[in-house]
Amino acid sequence: MKKYILVLSICFAIASQNAEAQNKEKKENKEGKVSAIDHAKAQFDYAFEEFAKVKASGAKGVSPRTTKGDTLVLVASKDWTSGFFSGNLWYMYELTKDKKWLEKAKEFSAPIEQEKTNGVTHDMGFKIYCSFGNGYRLTKDPKYRDIMIQSARTLITRFNPTVGCIRSWDHHAEVWDFPVIIDNMMNLELLFWAFKETKDSTFYKVAVSHANTTMKNHFRPDFSSYHVIGYDPKTGQVTKRNTHQGFSDESSWARGQAWGLYSYTMCYRETGDKKYLQQAEKIGNYILNHPSMPKDLVPYWDYNAPKIPNEPRDVSAATITASALYELSTMVPEKAVLYKETADKIMKSLNKTYKAEPLTNKGFLLIHSTGNLPAKSEIDVPIVYADYYYLEALLRKRKLNK
């Protein structure tokens, strides 16, 4: 009888916690009377209208990326951001179960298929995993599986075993012989997936080598990250350390820190190697305890930008961080509450202050992201990948609450 009462008590406690969490989610996701999901539905419907207008004017891009003035900017499939918009639509299908989003996700994914054999870029994960990866996860369409496997095979052709990394850029040859950027860590998820699907250990070995080499060379003692490490492709030696999109080479570019947190959390999930978990936690500690981090946890574009607080924010860095923290909360029981509540606080800030007004900003969900400030590109604008990791964070939050 005592065991029976104990079981009932535990069940009641869990049910109460779940109900409280779900009510909290509804409350936090509301801005006025519109929930985060309803806001996204309306914005994406508006985005489809704006996309059609731009296409009718002769634009040749396949996917929305950002805005420039009052113009919706589209990109070709080869652009590193081309997979995010269809990824957003796959997430909308997952969040709503409405087949309308399924059909739209298929429509916007299709033009990106040709990238599966594009070997002159490292951005295969961003383009293919965010689009067809989510599509395969949700539909198990064998065609999507084939596209992803081919994409993974294409990606590893850029691996240099002497360096131990996948080459990032082919441009700026006058600056770097073999550049590797922190963003490239995000593409490893495609390789881990390909290993599990094919049992070909080459994918796994390349991913682990890249993760280990990056962990060795990209991070400073305080676990902030350089953006670009230049290698000698013949010897594997480091030749340059730069922060190309940050304030200075020794500064901490906010999105780069977020990529590091997210990717090493993912590497621990895929390998079980605790050194990756420790790395993720240390990067997270650097981010969350940095003296330049604002109270709302939406960082400035660079933690060392000289005119803080009069510097642009980068909402994309915040959404990547929130999504990573939700996952990290499932891996560290003693810090689960801390990580989840911190992610919740970021999402609450985004919903309260950084959400686009309905039927504005060409249908993007969030405002105030910064792409590449040193190049005077995409400053204080909506950017598609900020929306992507925001929706992913909403999904992860929902799953945790349930």
Where are these regions (language model features)?
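Glycan-recognition and catalytic cores of secretory/periplasmic carbohydrate-active enzymes
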Residues: Q22-K402
